[in-house]
Amino acid sequence: GFASFLGKALKAALKIGANMLGGAPQQ
């Protein structure tokens, strides 16, 4: 449901933020 969507969005945002801040090797 909507909570599942929010969870996925949050995880995606965290992954993107980590990539931008930490320069993670994975694209």
UniProtKB/Swiss-Prot annotation:
Antimicrobial peptide. It comes from Xenopus ruwenzoriensis (Uganda clawed frog). GO terms for cellular component: extracellular region. Belongs to the gastrin/cholecystokinin family. It comes from the Eukaryota. This is Caerulein precursor fragment R8. GO terms for biological process: defense response. Keywords: Amphibian defense peptide, Antimicrobial, Secreted. Its main location: secreted. It is found in: Secreted. The keyword Secreted applies. Expressed by the skin glands.
